[in-house]
Amino acid sequence: MITMQHVRKTYKVSKRDAGFSSAFKALFHKEYEYIHALDDVSFTICDGEMVGYIGPNGAGKSSTIKILSGILTPEEGTCLINGLIPWKNRIEHVKNIGVVFGQRSQLWWDVPVMDSFELLKEIYKISTPSYNHNLEQLTDMLNLSELLKTPVRQLSLGQRMRCEIAASLLHDPKILFLDEPTIGLDAVSKLAVRDFILKLNKEKNTTVILTTHDMQDIEALTNRIILIGKGSILLDGTIDDIRKDYDSTEEALAAFYRSHNI
């Protein structure tokens, strides 16, 4: 179970006006401003749920995921995931989570996919029997057999994303964080990724938290959405709670953003 209660996160960033004189002045006298990325964020996600965590750019989605994965520490509030505080019990915590970023890679670009998998086996200290079992299962489910000996840089985007998902699941995590997992993929690759995620959730009861701007992904994969804007939770419910009188989810979401001035 994932529980966040009254979490706040603020970033201190330097500010200056454009121009050489302002840049020179900033060398001797820096001015700062504070950006409130998360403001009193609270929610609970039960085991096996598939949740869409959505909002416009700069809403606080990435900050939330980084706190949940143990990368960031909030100034206020509490976060408990399966009995662990992510940033305090990070080594133990990362054994139970998988993270996929659509625009970043955890694979090594100049070596075959299999070499990256072998290295991840050592990083996560996966036993050989468990590793072989998971690799065989993931290779079959994601159709990776012809890709394992190929250097990552030679893969298409769709092929690489399937390998990224497999890499994040080799250690059999209980929770999977997906950040734009289908960005840039063609229609066939998108369907393959969606089908796999649904099958994973059904067969292993894996908790899935999906952040994306692709509402087709949200509609196909999740039964609950949490909508964040300007660092605050604006809605926690279903797609129907937003859509109501609109023909499409995108149209309804745009109207929702306008009504909340975000």
What are these regions (language model features)?
Residues 236-237:
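ABC ATPase "signature
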Residues 191-203:
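Helical segment within the ABC ATPase nucleotide-binding domain
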Residues 19-26, 118, 122, 129-147:
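Conserved ABC ATPase "signature" region
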Residues 176-179:
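Catalytic Walker B motif of ABC-type/P-loop ATPase nucleotide-binding domains
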Residues 151-155:
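Conserved ABC ATPase signature
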